[in-house]
Design a protein with these regions (language model features):
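Histidine-centered active-site/metal-ligand motif
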Residues: 7, 60-62, 130-131
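A generic secondary-structure signal
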Residues: 74-82, 112-116, 195
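Short, intrinsically disordered, charge-balanced linker/junction segments flanking boundaries
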Residues: 20-21, 194-197
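C-terminal edge beta-strand
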Residues: 15-17
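Short, compositionally biased P/S/T/A/G/V-rich stretches that sit at domain boundaries
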Residues: 2-10, 20-22, 42-43
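N-terminal active-site segment of His-dependent metallophosphoesterases
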Residues: 22-105, 187
Length: 197
């Protein structure tokens, strides 16, 4: 259970809320009535007794790697600590792991945070977003160093790598269903499309 006491330091609670308004711009309105209107009806599928398994999804952790490392650690600790109860079988990270491609400390922070999943034996995959590879410059040096094929190839879900994990696919079988989860990082051209096909 979430308790305020666990999040107060020096009489201050720092709370980061990420959400998107209908316009796809960040929502900055103060929530005073205890709910955030996102025009989505909850169908109850997040109650563990109502589903057989689930995948956790992370994305855009760049600001956590840059400045809010504790939140990045907390996210992955929560996933690991709740994997059994929530039936989490796999984690998907869809990029922007770090904010600045050339800031080593951000990669080290991300490495530590994602290492929580490694240590727990939780299978996961990542891809390089525009922040991770300097967008149009396609600078994959740090991405390859910290999140290249060697990090993942021992996972039992890891299928095949494309150019040192610029792309890869994972194979997952759960609840009588088979999944192919395909990852492809930023700056794709016909060669990458051909590989995915």
């Amino acid at each position: 259970a979430f308790t305020v006491a666990n999040h107060v330091k020096n009489s201050t609670a720092t709370i980061i809320v990420q959400c998107t308004a209908d316009s796809a711009l960040p929502e900055l309105d103060t929530v005073t009535d205890g709910k955030l209107d996102n025009n989505a009806d909850w169908d109850g599928t997040t109650v563990p007794k109502d589903y057989d398994f689930c995948f956790a999804w992370e994305t855009d952790t760049q600001y956590y790697a840059e400045e809010w490392q504790n939140h990045f650690l907390n996210i992955n600790n929560w996933i690991v600590n709740n994997a059994e109860e929530r039936k989490i079988k796999y984690v998907i990270h869809t990029g922007d792991i770090v904010d600045d491609v050339d800031m080593t400390y951000e990669w080290e922070n991300a490495d530590e945070a994602m290492g929580i999943l490694d240590k727990a034996g939780m299978s996961y995959g990542v891809l390089g977003g525009n922040h991770d590879v300097a967008a149009g410059l396609a600078d994959y040096e740090n991405y390859y160093k910290y999140f290249g094929e060697n990090r993942f190839k021992s996972q039992n879900t890891y299928g095949e790598s494309y150019k040192n994990n610029k792309g890869h696919y994972d194979l997952i079988s759960e609840g009588g269903q088979d999944f192919i989860i395909v990852y492809m990082s930023w700056n794709i051209y016909q060669e990458e499309i051909d590989w995915m096909n």
